[in-house]
């Protein structure tokens, strides 16, 4: 079962591995919070050997993540306070039924810290950026400006030049 947390919606996809083709076949898909939950979901969710994955798209806010995992019936515990923006890594996380919401958020935060530390260590020299947090903010702005990876370098150079000019 895959929970997809996107910018505009949270969807749930129930899939089963076809041993013949070694591909996943979709059994059901629905939006989280839907009035009617497909029987395929509840039947699959309650099996012992089910794998659960939470996939978070880039651009999703911390509030959206907390709100989504708070509505997942496979998770337990309180999520706690909404973490600061930019502190949760967009990625795919495998979870187990009964996992703690706050522990999942801590995993997401640790993953983001690791990513940010690696980006900070490998940054170009002579950038007018003083902290990893400034690097994250600039990267977020660049990502908002263009989703095209080939354009990021040029957009980044425009921002760096503006910062250098003061």
Where are these regions (language model features)?
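Conserved catalytic or metal-liganding residues and their short signature motifs at active sites
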Residues: 1-166
């Amino acid at each position: 079962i895959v929970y997809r947390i996107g910018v505009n919606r949270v969807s749930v996809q129930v899939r089963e591995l076809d041993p013949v083709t070694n591909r996943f076949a979709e059994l059901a898909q629905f939006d989280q919070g839907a009035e009617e939950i497909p029987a395929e979901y509840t039947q699959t969710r309650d099996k012992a050997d089910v794998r659960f994955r939470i996939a978070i798209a880039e651009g999703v806010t911390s509030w959206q993540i907390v709100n989504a995992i708070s509505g997942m019936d496979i998770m337990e515990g309180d999520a706690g306070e909404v973490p600061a923006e930019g502190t949760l890594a967009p990625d795919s996380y495998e979870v187990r039924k009964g996992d703690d919401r706050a522990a999942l958020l801590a995993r997401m935060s640790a993953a983001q810290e690791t990513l940010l530390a690696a980006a900070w260590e490998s940054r170009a020299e002579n950038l007018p950026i003083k902290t990893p947090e400034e690097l994250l903010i600039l990267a977020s702005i660049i990502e908002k400006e263009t989703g095209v990876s080939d354009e990021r370098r040029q957009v980044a150079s425009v921002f760096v030049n503006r910062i250098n000019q003061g």
